Amino acid sequence: MLDWRLASAHFLLAMILMLWGSGKAFSVDLASEASEFGAESLQSPPTTREEKSATELAAKLLLLDDLVSLENDVFETKKKRSFSGFGSPLDRLSAGSVEHRGKQRRVVDHSKKRFGIPMDRIGRNRLSSSRG
């Protein structure tokens, strides 16, 4: 792994040296170019297009800030309510799944239900195999 890194580093250095020697490499002085660019930008006043884009950008940022503040107002944390009988407070989102007071429970008719016959009173041979 180290040999591969060393070989690739030598190859890159050789390519840079060849390009620099042939004059095809970038021979621009970056410090002088940066100072010229800085002086040029300070001398020329911003154009109307740049001013327009800056004001549009500021307006968009203010709009986004307003939207974020509205979103924070909407998504406030819910207050907790406590229910009698449970002893622990629940938030309002999970309260709907727990609360069953409003629902009426199904009434089961016990008159048709067959109760088992005691085995000590009747012999096993008298019981039918089917309940029909």
Swiss-Prot record:
Gene Ontology MF annotations: hormone activity; signaling receptor binding
Entry's localization field: Secreted
Single GO BP term: endochondral bone growth
Pfam families, per the entry: Musclin
PANTHER family found in the cross-reference section: OSTEOCRIN
Purpose of the protein: Hormone that acts as a ligand for natriuretic peptide receptor NPR3/NPR-C and promotes bone growth and physical endurance in muscle. Acts as a regulator of osteoblast differentiation and bone growth by binding to natriuretic peptide receptor NPR3/NPR-C, thereby preventing binding between NPR3/NPR-C and natriuretic peptides, leading to increase cGMP production. Required to enhance physical endurance: induced following physical exercise in muscle and promotes cGMP production, probably by interacting with NPR3/NPR-C.
Matches recorded under InterPro entries: Osteocrin
Modified residues (Arginine amide): R131
Gene Ontology cellular-component annotations: extracellular space
Keywords: Amidation, Cleavage on pair of basic residues, Developmental protein, Differentiation, Hormone, Osteogenesis, Secreted, Signal
The organism's place on the tree of life at top rank: Eukaryota
Organism: Rattus norvegicus
Name of the encoding gene: Ostn
Keyword Secreted (UniProt): yes
Induction: Is down-regulated by 1,25-dihydroxy vitamin D3.
Protein family according to the UniProt entry: Belongs to the Osteocrin family.
Protein name: Osteocrin
Complex and partners: Interacts with NPR3.
Residues in the signal sequence: 1-25
Expression sites by tissue: Highly expressed in skeletal muscle. Also expressed in leg tendons/ligaments and osteoblasts. In long bones and teeth, present in knee joint and periodontal ligaments (at protein level).
